Amino acid sequence: MGDAGGHSHHHQHGFQPQLLSFGGVGHHHHLHQFTAQPQPPAASHTRGRGGGGEIVPATTTPRSRGGGGGGGGEIVAVQGGHIVRSTGRKDRHSKVCTARGPRDRRVRLSAHTAIQFYDVQDRLGYDRPSKAVDWLIKNAKDAIDKLDVLPAWQPTAGGAGAGNAAAPPSSSTHPDSAENSDDQAQAITVAHTAFDFAGGGSGGTSFLPPSLDSDAIADTIKSFFPMGGTAGGEASSSTTAAQSSAMGFQSYTPDLLSRTGSQSQELRLSLQSLPDPMFHHQQHRHGGGGGGGNGTTQQALFSGAANYSFGGGAMWATEQQAQNQRMLPWNVPDPGGGGGAAYLFNVSQQAAHMQAAAAALGGHQSQFFFQRGPLQSSNQPSERGWPETVEADNQMSHHQGGLSPSVSAAIGFAAPGIGFSGFRLPARIQGDEEHNGGGGGNGDKPPPPSSVSSASHH
């Protein structure tokens, strides 16, 4: 069993580093066999035949290390030393305990040395290589005795020695197994991270390795989806990032998600809602001569908790045609007494006759800009109740713009001194712009209440 042909030596050599790597020293000594090849035959011969009492001390010292190198193998005492019987599946061959750690009983020789060795074996007439090695060691005994003797292991008793030899493998194997388990646990942790934001807030931090900074994740999400409010600046943990974003899509309505199947073709801008539920537009106060030139200005705020999505895909045009939406002129009462003109709008790509009229805002012309790209409001319920407010506030308006009951675009506002260029959306506006002077003026009337109420039901 200790002898094998040259082919088997070469075949099993590939598995040897895997077993020897557990001990930490076996791999190094395996390389040592290539540099000093005459020594391994002597070691294997000594273990195999159990002779040569002077060689035994050289094999006894590192038994504790040899057990660890065996990868949990069984240590068996033999004449002249000990062998480690491997229990692994990759390397089924036993190893011998040496002063430099466990070594394979099979020795691989260089081509030139193998030719000479088999020539000696054939000339001696031996059928096994180990017999030829025994003959070589016996004839070289005088030269071997002149070599330095390696540190010897002194066993206290035969049974105790075997027990001590059997004990170290478990003690030396545990650190390796613990280290391997740590590596596996780390690999599992990285595998479970797979950017698991879908967990909401349940155990999100336990799966994040130190390399993934939760703040960096939150900043990255906010750069693509500027949520503002709670999502901006307060995301200090992965759970907060997971709750404030599910990649930022929970803020959109389900019908919007169904329309936006192709994410790469659309640009979504999520605008955080502001406290004021109305959309104000800065304007001049309409009043008498003492009203002043600039008048009272109001902030331009986006309505409600709506996140507006801007997209330019043609897919939206076909899917939004089923919605009937209206554009209504609406005047917001000015706290200072004047009426402020603003527009409540909802957008669709409904292809029909597109008409609208421009309204004058405080003696300045309102500019309307249109381009490709719909503006979809995701806050539909809040706008359905607004026509009643529009009807009540129309009495306070000095100037209004009458618009067609059915339009397919939203209007962008521009007034001198505001610098707000407006939203650029597809539409056609037909009509004349009117200029109003001083304190009074005429304006087109808004759509009748019947059309207003019907718009709220779509």
From Swiss-Prot:
It comes from the Eukaryota. Residues 65-74 have a biased composition (Gly residues). It is found in: Nucleus. Residues 1-103, 159-182, 278-299, 424-458 are annotated as: Disordered. Residues 89-147 form the TCP domain. The lineage of its organism: Eukaryota, Viridiplantae, Streptophyta, Embryophyta, Tracheophyta. It holds the Pfam family TCP. Its main location: nucleus. Keywords: Activator, Developmental protein, DNA-binding, Nucleus, Transcription, Transcription regulation. Signal peptide: none annotated. GO terms for molecular function: DNA-binding transcription factor activity; sequence-specific DNA binding. The keyword Thylakoid does not apply. Forms homodimers and heterodimers. InterPro entries: TF_TCP_subgr (IPR017887), Transcription_factor_TCP (IPR005333). This is Transcription factor PCF5. It comes from Oryza sativa subsp. japonica (Rice). GO terms for cellular component: nucleus. Transcription activator. Binds the promoter core sequence 5'-GGNCC-3'.
